[in-house]
């Protein structure tokens, strides 16, 4: 993706050292019987490439409420710039900053803000979104308007997207007067296309 915006990136940047870090992921889910009990999944999208364990802001904050009895799913997105009481500091700050203290802090912050249990969570970053969409063979999204972003052009109507196109589609906000609201809708469009 860097290469798309900086064609000389490979020639101008030299890798001098790399390190692999393994991190055990703590499971703090509140498990329920998903076949007959409604449950909530929190999806945190962090604004980085590479390892999913990278410390970063939580820019996508999506609540997926699943009711297996009615076979319905409700998507609710909370804007990253909402001021909420952060679980780790007990003071108000932007929701996006909760991610800096890790996914458990963000889940606890969201649960307190919404006044409900979060049964499961998933953390996604730029790399994992591209990988998932490509693993599906791409996705078909019903694009709601013509625009260009990240070197890609999106046309009104059904459009097939690979991982990089889906990422650029779900990140763009500067092309729209109501940018953050449109970006949230596009993020939901991408998730629904993946299901």
Predicted regions and their residues:
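Non-catalytic, solvent-exposed segments at the cell envelope interface
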Residues: 1-195
């Amino acid at each position: 993706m860097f290469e798309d915006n900086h064609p000389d990136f490979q020639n101008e940047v030299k890798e001098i050292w790399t390190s692999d870090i393994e991190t055990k992921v703590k499971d703090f889910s509140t498990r329920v019987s998903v076949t007959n009990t409604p449950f909530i999944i929190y999806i945190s999208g962090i604004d980085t490439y590479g390892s999913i364990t990278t410390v970063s802001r939580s820019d996508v904050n999506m609540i997926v409420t699943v009711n297996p009895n009615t076979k319905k799913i409700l998507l609710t997105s909370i804007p990253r710039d909402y001021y909420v009481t952060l679980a780790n500091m007990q003071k108000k700050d932007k929701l996006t900053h909760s991610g800096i203290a890790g996914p458990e802090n963000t889940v606890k912050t969201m649960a307190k803000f919404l006044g409900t249990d979060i049964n499961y969570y998933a953390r996604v970053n730029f790399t994992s979104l591209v990988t998932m969409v490509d693993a599906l063979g791409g996705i078909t999204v019903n694009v709601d308007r013509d625009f260009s972003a990240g070197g890609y052009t999106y046309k009104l109507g059904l459009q097939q997207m690979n991982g990089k196109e889906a990422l650029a589609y779900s990140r763009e906000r500067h092309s729209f007067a109501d940018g953050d609201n449109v970006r949230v809708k596009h993020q939901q469009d991408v998730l629904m296309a993946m299901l």
